[in-house]
Amino acid sequence: MVCFSHSGMGFFKCCLAWTFVVLACVFASSSPDIPNNEDTKPLWNATWTDKLKRKLLTHYDKFSRPAQHTNATVVKMVLTFRHFELDELKSVLTVYGWMRMAWTDEKLKWNQTEWGGLHELHLADHEIWQPDIILYNSASGSSIDHYGNSHCVVFPTGEVIWVPPAQFLVFCDLDLRLWPYDTQTCHLTLGSWTYDGDQVDLQLDGHTDGFEMELWNSNSEWQVEDVKGNRAEQYYSCCTEPYVDVTYNITLRRRSPAYSAIVITPAAAIVLMTLAGFWLPPNAGEKILLNGCTAIIICLFLLYFSQKLPAMAGHTPLVGTIS
């Protein structure tokens, strides 16, 4: 490019363009060579695990169910309960535990003798297909992510075991009439979100009835009275295929030693103070003072209930009604 313009502005633009060209050539010549990924080799020798993982996961589609469409994928479930928290104001039960799910992946089979005797393979949960087991009666709003991140264990037969930590929030119909000596029953209903029973068949583990309590936190406010797991097939008018769900019926009894001191003792004191007001002579000055103190204590007592318990018609605690 040669600048033939006689005008000052044209000559300036031409020089500016030449400057950009020269700078581009300088940066291009000084930039380091980018190595070709195809020529790079790892600095370590591939293990049997590396080779097997590369073979199994190459062209693996984690969004495709690993079975023929005519065959159902059987998922065996075991829920290990660890801790319960009940929010009376929101009528929501929070369940903490582990969810054990086991199924067979036809795409993840191998012969041990051909792969150095490798008897298991650990894969990240996002690398392979997983059943979309969701809590149907969830109280967590738009979030349906019940499970934490954990690895899956795969065996040569194609069996996959996944045991993620789980947290479920479920609505409960609370009956607080006997509070704080109440017993509550809540239900967790789990099922596949997109697959029917002919595609994903949920089964309760026969050895544990679908749940375990060995790791239960015994220091919880609630004592587990009973847990039952039931499998059911639901049919809807839209479809001919069954939809399988698993329901855990949980019965909890409140442990109330602390509530006896906080609630029952003041309630008994209110009753005695009210009776004492009738026992005093009508013209006694202490009677007005005693009745005034009783009214203040009752107001504080009811204020405590309003902050602790929901205002539900037909479920008012008897201890609050008596006071």
Write out the residue ranges for each language-model feature:
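N-terminal secretory signal peptides that target proteins for export/translocation
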Residues: 1-9
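Non-transmembrane, solvent-exposed beta-strand/loop segments in proteins
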Residues: 10-12, 18-19, 25-292, 304-322
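Winged helix-turn-helix DNA-binding recognition segment
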Residues: 295
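Aromatic-anchored segments of alpha-helical transmembrane domains
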Residues: 298-304
